[in-house]
Amino acid sequence: MTQQAKTFTTQISKTTALNYLLHLPPGVEDGEKRPFILFLHGAGERGDDLDLIRLHGLPKVIDSDPDFPFIVASPQCPALTTWSVLVDALKALVDELVAAYPIDPNRLYLTGLSMGGYGSWNLASTYPDLFAAVVPICGGGGWFFGFPERVVALKDTPVWAFHGAQDEIVPLSETAVLIETLHQAHGTAPIRFTIYPNLNHDSWTITYDDPELYSWFLRQKKQ
């Protein structure tokens, strides 16, 4: 008996649990629709200890500024996995939060650092109509997830990417190839790429500390 070619088809459902920090700005109880940011942390903050998320990025900013004017969700990636395989769960989380809180669906923003930068590129490319703007920091795409080609899905989504030129953990080229691919797609949305010539991997502290980032977010709104 020779080997025979066969096809097996099945549908598998799974349950995914994500712990997250949720920031609600003062006055949110008035019901006015607020802008929303989904923040994705880096690899070092994975696990089941939410305090790890407070070490870097937006949760750190919010801890020092409780009046931060955006609604912000900062989920924690479970140990031994990555954001890029959790994109459907992240989309479901955003949908749930939009339904439960006074969030403006036309002002949903996405950002992440390092592994969260990879997750931002991947999530936004998977659901290109979801976010009004995307800010990946020191991330990339990964050929095994179909990048850089997949990033063309974001040609009509405003993107502002950041990277340190001296980054030895995630090379600058990881972001550069995605930005170049976006430019070649000739989309309708603005593309910005900030390179910090003297910074290594931590290009997020200076970025999240800059008020211009949040002003730029607010200038982006889905029509």
Residue ranges of each PLM-predicted region?
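Gly/Ser-rich "nucleophile elbow"/oxyanion-hole loop immediately N-terminal to the catalytic nucleophile
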Residues: 26-32, 78-115, 128-130
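Short, solvent-exposed loop/turn and secondary-structure capping segments
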Residues: 32-33, 48-52, 84-87, 123, ...
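Active-site machinery of serine-nucleophile hydrolases
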Residues: 34-36, 40-91
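Solvent-exposed loop/turn segments at secondary-structure junctions
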Residues: 42-46, 78-82, 114-118, 140-143, ...
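The feature captures the conserved acid-bearing segment of alpha/beta-hydrolase catalytic domains
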Residues: 132-215
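Primarily recognizes the serine-hydrolase "nucleophile elbow" in alpha/beta-hydrolase
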Residues: 99-100, 106-153
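Short helix-capping segments at alpha-helix termini
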Residues: 65-67, 100-102, 129-130, 183-188
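A domain-start/cap signature at the N-terminus of enzymes
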Residues: 1-36, 70, 111-113, 118, ...
